[in-house]
């Protein structure tokens, strides 16, 4: 057992567990529901052999503002129910599912992202995912989408309809090496208000033949 508040306001298990690579299952006790963490930064970072999380419904995230690196390098984590996450106060989701290569499906349909500003590398190298419906995400405050889907090499479709991209300043390598994408609908993207860096945005998207955009899509620097 570990205390919930350790270094940098994160639980003791983040910094004081030398055996993270041996952990295959995490179980949240019902008593954990009484805790009100303010950050989930790096909670399971480096748990490379973690396959399942039980009792995640007892994790109350209503006060959490930071989820970056939360599951970074949880390469063997399989389908997990995130539907109970309260993300209304979260501002940073960068690298949240970075290198979660065994996730074959990801339901974050209940995520409220109205305060999120950083989605950098959020799904980086999620090679198990073949489709993502993210049309519900509120991206009105997001300024960074760098590397968001980079190396999602098996992603066949991604629904980004309804996204508000007026505040995004970087889409660098956003879809780089999404080698299986054939079409991409960015018709809702508005990049006129910011000078948006787009370097390598579609690098090595070898199968991508069609990109739908509107007259609101101003080609940024580095494309």
Positions of PLM-derived features:
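LRR flanking "cap" motifs
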Residues: 1-36
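Intrinsically disordered regions, especially transient/low-confidence alpha-helical propensity segments
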Residues: 10-12, 40, 160
């Amino acid at each position: 057992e570990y205390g919930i508040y350790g270094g940098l306001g994160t639980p003791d298990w983040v910094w004081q567990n030398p055996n993270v690579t041996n952990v295959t299952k995490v179980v949240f006790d019902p008593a954990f529901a009484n805790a009100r963490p303010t950050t989930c930064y790096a909670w399971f970072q480096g748990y490379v052999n973690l396959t399942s999380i039980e009792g995640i419904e007892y994790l109350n995230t209503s006060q959490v503002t930071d989820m970056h690196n939360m599951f970074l390098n949880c390469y063997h984590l399989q389908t997990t129910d995130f539907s109970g996450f309260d993300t209304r106060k979260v501002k940073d989701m960068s690298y949240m599912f970075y290198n979660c290569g065994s996730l074959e499906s990801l339901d974050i349909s209940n995520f409220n992202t109205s305060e999120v500003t950083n989605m950098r590398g959020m799904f980086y190298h999620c090679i198990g995912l073949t489709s993502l419906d993210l049309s519900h995400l509120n991206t009105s405050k997001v300024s960074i989408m760098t590397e968001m889907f980079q190396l999602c090499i098996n992603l066949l479709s991604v629904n980004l309809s309804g996204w508000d991209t007026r505040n995004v300043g970087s889409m660098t390598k956003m879809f780089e090496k999404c080698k299986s994408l054939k079409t991409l609908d960015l018709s809702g993207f508005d990049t006129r208000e910011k000078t948006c860096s787009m370097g390598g945005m579609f690098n090595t998207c070898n199968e991508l033949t069609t990109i739908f955009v509107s007259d609101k899509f101003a080609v940024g620097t580095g494309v």
